[in-house]
């Protein structure tokens, strides 16, 4: 490796916008390493990070309010280029001598920005740009040493710049796809203004991760809880590439997986890629622990607790293992970082081996902790994992445990597995699978009357669920063709003995959540 992929870096200060992680993903997409920190970071931390440029994100607060967030003064004393986006532009203007006021007309949605003058930010772009606005306040006076470089009909200062100091501000969101040339603007800032090189690529990330794993664990043995999900699968491939047979994967079949999933995991990682895998058939143990429990959070906790017990027992048999590999990714790290003002993301309890007992006394190997999910998928492809595995729809950590409503029983799981497999198979056959963001089947523990032949029968009900979403924070139910839904329903009722009725969930998020439990 000729250059350290972390040598050139952008710091993004988070003021709370729903799009902030998207800014970071775009910078990574450009090929430059970046980190996302809360706006109230200490000067010493910025100095130590030593960024080549700083981006101030958007945010929900109003600069006109007392005690609203401000960028640390060091941002403007550091001598590095600064790019303020939406709220970031407003706080930049206010802090450097301009003025912000609440607008008479709020601007949400598409707008056209007329570019004026020549700016490095808009290099090689047309003089009219389609952009995405989302603001109630606006800059009404720019700082004395700034010039206007863009305006809309309702926003006189849609973009401003101090070319000498390399300070830029835009009132719109260049990070969203609705801003047609937003990525080019970010490229102009990151590559052009900040002078960064494209060192952050899938190949270089793999090379760096493998080198770091080797350095961290030396000749020690490592264990990994392999679920067959994207994160743990990519960790398995990376660690195996680094240390080969010194990695042992523990695959716990809890009886709550999709149809044939256990066999597929063993076949892919054991037979095809040659990893050491211990398969633990723990279906009976999990179902026994879940007996009589019908409350969703209690089910989650029970599944998590039993997984930890099983994994702990298996790890004790591997007495030489000194390291535990985990699939922690960058959004987990961001969510776990508490801001000193309490405004940062709260810690989320993830269903993974993060809850393992303290007495395991193992070091952690987390090769994905700098990566976003889309980056994890890209390096998974580079490592040889199949596309359809890396890009399949999300599956909850507790598995069918939260897709069987109420108490979980083997009979219910077996019926649900088969019904769900039919739904997914038909989505692929109709070329609809990649057109929806997530699709699955839910088992309802209620019997409904049906007619089969000359007789009536009371059998179970399942619900099909398919949604379209960009970020999973909000979602629309997918308008699947009636003919398609009819075909899926007929197949399930005819092929899965025990199901007499199929319904389709047409609830959006909000008010409903995507999963039923």
Swiss-Prot record:
GO terms for cellular component: cytosol. Its EC number is 6.3.5.2. Residues 200-392 form the GMPS ATP-PPase domain. The active site is at 86 (nucleophile), 173, 175. The keyword Ligase applies. It catalyses: XMP + L-glutamine + ATP + H2O = GMP + L-glutamate + AMP + diphosphate + 2 H(+). GO terms for biological process: GMP biosynthetic process. Pathway: Purine metabolism; GMP biosynthesis; GMP from XMP (L-Gln route): step 1/1. GO terms for molecular function: ATP binding; GMP synthase activity. It comes from the Bacteria. Keywords: ATP-binding, Glutamine amidotransferase, GMP biosynthesis, Ligase, Nucleotide-binding, Purine biosynthesis. InterPro entries: Class_I_gatase-like, GATASE, GMP_synth_C, GMP_synth_GATase, GMP_synthase, GMPS_ATP_PPase_dom, NAD/GMP_synthase, Rossmann-like_a/b/a_fold. Residues 9-199 form the Glutamine amidotransferase type-1 domain. The keyword ATP-binding applies. It is an enzyme of class 6 (ligase). It holds the Pfam family NAD_synthase. Coiled coil: none annotated. ATP binds at residues 227-233. PANTHER family: GMP SYNTHASE [GLUTAMINE-HYDROLYZING], GMP SYNTHASE-RELATED. Homodimer. Catalyzes the synthesis of GMP from XMP. This is GMP synthase [glutamine-hydrolyzing]. It comes from Vibrio cholerae serotype O1 (strain ATCC 39315 / El Tor Inaba N16961). The lineage of its organism: Bacteria, Pseudomonadati, Pseudomonadota, Gammaproteobacteria, Vibrionales.
């Amino acid at each position: 490796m000729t250059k350290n992929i972390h040598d050139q870096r952008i710091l993004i200060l988070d003021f709370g916008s729903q799009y902030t992680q998207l800014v970071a993903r775009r910078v990574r997409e450009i090929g430059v390493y970046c980190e996302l920190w809360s706006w109230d970071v200490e000067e010493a931390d910025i100095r130590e990070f030593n960024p080549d440029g700083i981006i101030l994100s958007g945010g929900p607060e109003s600069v006109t309010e007392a005690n609203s967030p401000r960028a640390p003064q060091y941002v403007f004393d550091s001598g590095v280029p600064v790019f303020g986006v939406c709220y970031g532009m407003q706080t930049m203007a206010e802090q450097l001598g301009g003025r912000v006021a609440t607008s008479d007309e709020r601007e949400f949605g598409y707008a056209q920005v007329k570019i004026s003058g020549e700016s490095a930010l808009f290099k090689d772009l047309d003089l009219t740009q389609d952009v995405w606005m989302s603001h109630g306040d606006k800059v009404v006076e720019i700082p004395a040493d700034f010039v206007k470089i863009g305006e809309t009909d309702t926003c006189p200062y849609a973009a401003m710049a101090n070319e000498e100091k390399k300070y830029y501000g835009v009132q719109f969101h260049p990070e969203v796809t609705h801003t047609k040339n937003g990525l080019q603007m970010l490229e102009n800032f990151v590559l052009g203004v900040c002078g960064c090189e494209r060192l952050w690529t899938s190949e270089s990330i793999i090379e760096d991760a493998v080198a770091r794993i080797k350095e961290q664990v030396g000749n020690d043995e490592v264990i990994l809880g392999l679920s067959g999900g994207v994160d743990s699968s990519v960790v398995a491939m990376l660690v195996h590439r680094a240390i080969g047979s010194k990695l042992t994967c523990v695959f716990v079949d809890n009886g709550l997986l999709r149809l044939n999933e256990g066999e597929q995991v063993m076949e892919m990682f054991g037979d095809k890629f040659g990893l050491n895998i211990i398969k633990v058939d723990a279906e009976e143990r999990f179902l026994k622990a879940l007996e009589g429990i019908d409350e969703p959070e209690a089910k989650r906790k029970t599944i998590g607790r039993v997984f930890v017990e099983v994994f702990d027992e298996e790890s004790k048999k591997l007495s030489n293992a000194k390291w535990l590999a985990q699939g922690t990714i960058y959004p987990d790290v961001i969510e776990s970082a508490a801001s000193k003002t309490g405004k940062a993301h709260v810690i989320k309890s993830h269903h993974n081996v993060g809850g393992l007992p303290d007495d395991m006394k193992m070091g952690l190997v987390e090769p994905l902790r700098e990566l976003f999910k889309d980056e994890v998928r890209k390096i998974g492809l580079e490592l040889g994992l199949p596309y359809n595995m890396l890009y399949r729809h999300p599956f909850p950590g507790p598995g069918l445990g939260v897709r069987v409503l109420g108490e979980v029983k083997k009979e219910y799981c077996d019926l649900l597995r088969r019904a769900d497999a039919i739904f997914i198979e038909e989505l692929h056959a109709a070329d609809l699978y990649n057109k929806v963001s997530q699709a699955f089947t839910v088992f309802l523990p209620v019997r409904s009357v049906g007619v089969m032949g000359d007789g009536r029968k009371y059998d179970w009900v399942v619900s099909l669920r398919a949604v379209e979403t960009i970020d999973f924070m909000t979602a629309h139910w997918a308008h699947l063709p009636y003919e398609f839904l009819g075909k899926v329903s007929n197949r399930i009722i005819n092929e899965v003995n025990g199901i007499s009725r199929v319904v389709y969930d047409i609830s959006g998020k909000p008010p409903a959540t995507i999963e039923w439990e």
